[in-house]
A protein has these predicted regions:
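C-terminal ends and interior cores of transmembrane alpha-helices
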Residues: 80-101, 319-335
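Extracytoplasmic gate region of multi-pass secondary transporters
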Residues: 26-27, 236-293, 355, 359, ...
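A late C-terminal transmembrane helix in Major Facilitator Superfamily
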Residues: 363-398
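Cytoplasmic helix-loop-helix junction between adjacent transmembrane helices
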Residues: 111-150
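C-terminal transmembrane helical hairpin of 12-TM major facilitator-type secondary transporters
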Residues: 310-357
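Central cavity-lining transmembrane alpha-helices of secondary-active solute carriers
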Residues: 49-64, 282-295
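Extracytoplasmic
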Residues: 7-39, 258-263
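Helix-loop-helix hairpin linking two adjacent transmembrane segments in secondary transporters
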Residues: 150-199
Length: 432
């Protein structure tokens, strides 16, 4: 097969779609869960935020392990773990009441933390896989293809989960989603290898294409040429990597804000029932499905056209976040549901436009440490997965839903400022 790497990327897309359906399912099941266990808005925000505590540590450990043990080991371990935890989520309330003295929230909290730990390694492992399987000239494209499952998964979560909940219980939903994850793990174990050199399906022609340095820029590094003696703590001496991490934080804050709170926002502010959310919940993610893909292509096109990674990565990300911030700033002053949904869709589309950039910067700068540096990046970035849902619960309870979008603007501005200091691919300053 001449393009087996694209089959591998397709499998990753399927996995990230399952991954994001798993994450988003609880937001659509919130009405039934809240009604059954009596959670208030602040408690519910905390439950959503518990995921992030585990996610931070899972991403850090997963990235380091991917460098040491290889991405295949991490994929199989993490995929099996999160699928089993997803099944256990069906019994979270009962677990809490049985073990933690009648506290249902403790049961949900524990399993949300475990769910976060097991899902945490995924994106740093995607980055490690791309570093091993992608030629330098297509890093932006393959990163975008690998990440397109995020908005696609969020998009189809709305009709799948909302439709399912109209005919069956939220408990059965979690069980079925967990089983789907286990099926993916079984297939992946048979088709994937850490390096294309180890895979019988990869032809010599394709391998030469992957390892080719044709069209590479002078500042770009490859798996073979980059100094592998670099230590994990060198990350914090690199303004490139630290700035990129802060920029990515802004993206992740807005991403999780929309993923976790949109269903409840629509139900509370506009009084929509669950059967209406199957299509309304899709709208914010429609544009993102296109921009997540074309953003990677546009970044690689700018790289080729200008020969300047700062323009192709940093300035490109800044432009997208500026446009997103403008959209979210307008929403609190808009009272039409049609206008609100359009602005959410456009704003989220611009947020996802540079999604692949944050991972491409790591690969461009330190391909041999992509797993470790990706894990460190994701650890700090994923503080947003705690802060966004938890802070939103507090803001909504005290000041209303308009503050939810103001916080998205602030997060976007943080990202914009940070990316101004990112010069991708330049010689790592960590040893100087």
């Amino acid at each position: 097969m001449k393009r087996y790497r694209y089959f591998i990327i397709t499998m990753i897309v399927i996995m990230t779609m399952i991954n994001y359906i798993d994450r988003g399912a609880i937001s659509y099941a919130q009405e039934d869960i809240i009604k059954e266990f009596g959670f208030d808005t602040i408690a519910w925000g905390s439950i959503l935020g518990y995921f992030g505590y585990g996610y931070m540590f899972g991403s850090l450990l997963g990235g380091i392990t991917a460098d040491k043990k290889g991405p295949k080991f991490v994929w199989i371990l993490a995929g099996t773990a999160w699928s089993l935890v997803e099944i256990a989520m069906a019994f979270a309330g009962e677990l809490g009441m049985a073990i933690f003295g009648g506290s249902a929230i403790a049961g949900f909290g524990l399993l949300r933390v475990l769910f976060g730990i097991s899902e945490g390694p995924i994106f740093s492992t995607i980055s490690k896989t791309n570093a091993n399987w992608a030629a330098p000239r297509e890093r932006g494209l393959l990163s975008a293809l690998g990440l397109i499952g995020v908005p696609l998964g969020a998009l189809i979560t709305a009709p799948i989960v909302s439709g399912f909940l109209t005919i069956a219980s939220w408990r059965l939903l979690f069980v079925i989603l967990g089983i789907l994850g286990l099926v993916w793990v079984i297939i992946w174990a048979k088709v994937f290898t850490d390096y294309p050199e180890d895979n019988k399906k990869v032809s010599e022609e394709e391998l030469n294409d992957i390892r080719s340095t044709n069209e590479s820029l002078n500042v770009e590094k490859t798996v073979e040429t980059e100094d592998s003696s670099e230590k994990w703590y060198h990350f914090f001496k690199s303004p490139i990597l630290v700035g990129n991490m802060i920029g990515y934080f802004g993206f992740q804050y807005v991403n999780f804000l929309i993923l976790t709170w949109t269903p409840k926002y629509l139900q509370d502010e506009y009084h929509f029932e669950i059967h209406s959310l199957w299509y309304l919940g899709m709208i914010p993610w429609i544009g993102a499905c296109f921009t997540a893909y074309f953003g990677g292509q546009m970044s690689d096109w700018l790289r080729k056209k200008t020969g300047n990674l700062r323009i192709a990565r940093s300035y490109f990300a800044i432009a997208g976040m500026i446009c997103a911030a403008i959209c979210f700033l307008i929403i609190p002053f808009t009272h039409s549901i049609v206008a609100v949904m359009i602005l959410m869709m456009i704003g989220n589309a611009f947020i996802f436009l540079p999604n692949a950039v944050y991972w491409s910067v790591i690969i461009d700068t330190a391909p041999n440490k992509t797993g470790t540096y990706g894990g460190i990046t994701h650890f700090f970035v994923n503080t947003a997965t705690v802060i966004a849902p938890t802070l939103t619960g507090i803001l909504v309870a005290t000041h209303g839903y308009s503050t939810m979008f103001i916080s998205a603007v602030v997060a976007s501005l943080i990202s914009i400022i940070a990316m101004c200091f990112v010069r991708p691919g330049e010689k790592n300053m960590s040893r100087h």
